Curated annotation (Swiss-Prot):
Family membership: Belongs to the conotoxin T superfamily.
Residue span(s) of the pro-peptide: 19-28
InterPro entries associated with the record: T-conotoxin
Subcellular location: Secreted
Name of the featured protein: Conotoxin Im5.4
Organism in which the protein naturally occurs: Conus imperialis (Imperial cone)
Upper classification of the organism: Eukaryota, Metazoa, Spiralia, Lophotrochozoa, Mollusca
Amino acid sequence: MRCLPVVVFLLLLLSAAAAPGVGSKTERLPGLTSSGDSDESLPFLNTICCWSGACCGG
């Protein structure tokens, strides 16, 4: 479970780094926060979780 904070930190870094470069995605975020948020904006999160072994349980 020690790697979970690292994964969260990396995700925050990626989000902060990608936000300025992805204007269209940032504009769509307010509309997605209700239900589409988990489907639209978190596939990379699941990928990193699986890659690190923190979420998938592999």
